[in-house]
Amino acid sequence: MTAVAPEGRPLLRIEARNAQTPIERKPSWIRTRLRTGPQYQDVKGLVQSAGLHTVCEEAGCPNIYECWEDREATFLIGGEVCTRRCDFCQIDSGRPAPLDHDEPRRVAESVATMGLRYATVTGVARDDLADGGSWLYAETVRQIHARSADTGVEVLIPDFGGRPDQLGEVFEAAPEVLAHNLETVPRIFRRIRPAFRYERSLDVLRQARQAGLVTKSNLILGLGETAEEIHTALRDLRSAGCELLTVTQYLRPTPRHHPVERWVRPEEFLDWGRVGAELGFSGVMSGPLVRSSYRASRLYQQAMTARDQDRSEMSVPPESVSENSHGQRPSPW
């Protein structure tokens, strides 16, 4: 009998091959402590009473306690089915439902109801749409800004096929941070992300930086990459103008997904954080349980501080740079 995926379709060949490897046992350091405070309890109460939906809860994110305590949350837009399949991602692939044009308003109302200081908006790829879903991402940013002027918005986008018009629509909505995740290294990129292209992902970040946006990306470890390849990918990201970086451990969602090639120890994550700083990233979060939206507002503020410092150094005589101190850019969050 042919094996089937939970959504009823036959397993892809790569899924059947992956499923031959049992789910790996997690090491002792892949765990989180339950730490709740008044802000977390308040946000949780608002979410429950209003029937709101966040990626934080529905994906079982281990960082929900910290993020909600900081009044930060992540929302998924565009539906629950992606037109692309990445070998690490738990979101189903297939034919999505029709676009919900009211979704941006509802997300913005959720952000306002929860009293968020910072919201991350991510979503599925919508290659079935003429604009790739760019309007949906842009409109969600606009709606949040309109209802919650003091809330920072980070948008994590697909590559929109690298099309400047679709990317430009999102850029013009002026999110505080434009994120696009590279995720892995060139040698295994096509296997892990067959519908994406390594250079195209770098070009998305390059275009966003040229548009003046704060740029951010993520690299997943444990997919089969080498240390030298990680270093090359980090250099490529910096060369593309990427300012903020998260480095994460791959956690296999189901047996159908890519096996975990190795568990990266916490000390190595610290090393990659130092490498990122040495390469010139304005902010780096690197750890086994870090996710791309983890402590997002803190990273954004680090990027703004670095930009202000750069402007300060450019506006004073070289001999006086070391004598000038510079405070952090004012921020409501």
UniProtKB/Swiss-Prot annotation:
SMART domains: Elp3
Main location: cytoplasm
The keyword Cytoplasm appears for this protein: yes
Gene3D superfamilies linked: Aldolase class I
Residue intervals of the Radical SAM core domain: 68-282
Pfam families: LIAS_N (PF16881), Radical_SAM (PF04055)
Cited InterPro entries: Aldolase_TIM, Elp3/MiaA/NifB-like_rSAM, LIAS_N, Lipoyl_synth, rSAM
Source species, domain of life: Bacteria
GO molecular function: 4 iron, 4 sulfur cluster binding; lipoate synthase activity; metal ion binding
Binding-site list for [4Fe-4S] cluster 2: 82, 86, 89
Stated name of the protein: Lipoyl synthase
Organism of this sequence: Frankia casuarinae (strain DSM 45818 / CECT 9043 / HFP020203 / CcI3)
Lineage: Bacteria, Bacillati, Actinomycetota, Actinomycetes, Frankiales
